[in-house]
């Protein structure tokens, strides 16, 4: 779309059918994860051609108010199950040097929208936060729902890992939401849309640009397109919108407690999806 939206989300399945073909390909991983948890992780491993002639998102404004939803998650028809080599590391990394308190810990990159929270410009009666966002000189209220058990999840993750918030949404929305959500200072860094790579219509989180050893990096995200460059590092989760009985984040804690003790992440993630 010509005018980038404020919030990057996947489509709510209540409103339209989504990615049914893609979901079929990941059922095997979901089955193995169900053996460890009562609810499945929406698990996917993708490989694709990588285009290094990246086009930046257009900034031409053609409408007064950007739409709420910038969809991120659909893969283009040309994205076949093949892998291209990762390019040389960038001269400047996205993350600062590791602090002494995080030395020896793995880095967990955590998505925001539909992973930890769900946000809407439409009023939500039970919203946990209401965040004012300025768009074209007008203040709009964004209503934010916290995913069940997000507090317990973040607190435990902060104890086990170097945690980084990485969202394809804009900082003007995501930063104040993170201020309200992360009361414990779990996130050592926050990365927003400008830190993503715009690839074939999606905002991709290129983990090679973080400045961390990839064998010790995990990404937690509901959108397969977000980690399409590094699917072997992903712990996918189901998109969350408003189900207050959801326990996915709570169910993930034991898995991450085990993963934190591993020398590298690939073996455990590979075994998990190949049982």
UniProtKB/Swiss-Prot annotation:
It catalyses: O-phospho-L-seryl-[protein] + H2O = L-seryl-[protein] + phosphate; O-phospho-L-threonyl-[protein] + H2O = L-threonyl-[protein] + phosphate. Residues 101-259 form the FCP1 homology domain. SUPFAM superfamilies: HAD-like. It is found in: Nucleus. Mg(2+) binds at residues 111, 113, 222. The keyword Nucleus applies. GO terms for molecular function: metal ion binding; RNA polymerase II CTD heptapeptide repeat phosphatase activity. Its main location: nucleus. Its cofactor is Mg(2+). The active site is at residues 111, 113. Transmembrane segments: none annotated. Binds 1 Mg(2+) ion per monomer. One of its GO terms (cellular component) is nucleus. The record marks 167, 205 as: Transition state stabilizer. PROSITE patterns: FCP1. Its EC number is 3.1.3.16. Keywords: Hydrolase, Magnesium, Metal-binding, Nucleus, Protein phosphatase. Monomer. Interacts with LDB1. PANTHER family: DULLARD PROTEIN PHOSPHATASE. Preferentially catalyzes the dephosphorylation of 'Ser-5' within the tandem 7 residue repeats in the C-terminal domain (CTD) of the largest RNA polymerase II subunit POLR2A. Negatively regulates RNA polymerase II transcription, possibly by controlling the transition from initiation/capping to processive transcript elongation. Recruited by REST to neuronal genes that contain RE-1 elements, leading to neuronal gene silencing in non-neuronal cells. This is CTD small phosphatase-like protein. It comes from Gallus gallus. The gene is NFI1.
């Amino acid at each position: 779309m010509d005018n980038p939206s404020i919030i990057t989300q996947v489509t709510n399945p209540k409103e339209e059918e989504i990615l049914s073909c893609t979901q079929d390909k990941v059922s095997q991983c979901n089955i193995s994860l169900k053996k460890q948890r009562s609810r499945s992780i929406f698990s996917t491993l993708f490989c694709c051609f990588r285009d290094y002639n990246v086009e930046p998102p257009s900034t031409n404004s053609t409408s007064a108010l950007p739409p709420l939803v910038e969809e991120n998650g659909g893969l283009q028809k040309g994205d076949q199950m093949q892998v291209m080599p990762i390019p040389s590391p960038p001269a400047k990394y996205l993350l600062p040097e590791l602090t002494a308190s995080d030395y020896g810990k793995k880095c967990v990159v955590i998505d925001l929208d539909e992973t930890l929270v769900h946000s809407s410009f439409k009023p939500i009666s039970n919203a946990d936060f209401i965040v004012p966002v300025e768009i074209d000189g007008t203040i709009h209220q964004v209503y934010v729902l916290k995913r069940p058990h997000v507090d317990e999840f973040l607190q435990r993750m902060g104890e086990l890992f170097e945690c980084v918030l990485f969202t394809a949404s804009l900082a003007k929305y995501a930063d104040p939401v993170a201020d309200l959500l992360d009361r414990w200072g779990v996130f050592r860094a926050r990365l927003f849309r400008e830190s993503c790579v715009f690839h074939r219509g999606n905002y991709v989180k290129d983990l090679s640009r973080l400045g961390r050893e990839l064998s010790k990096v995990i990404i937690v995200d509901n959108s397969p397109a977000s980690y399409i460059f590094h699917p072997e590092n992903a712990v996918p989760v189901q998109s969350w919108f408003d189900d207050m009985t959801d326990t996915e984040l709570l169910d993930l804690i034991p898995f991450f407690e085990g993963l934190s003790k591993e020398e590298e992440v690939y073996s455990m993630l590979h075994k998990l999806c190949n049982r």
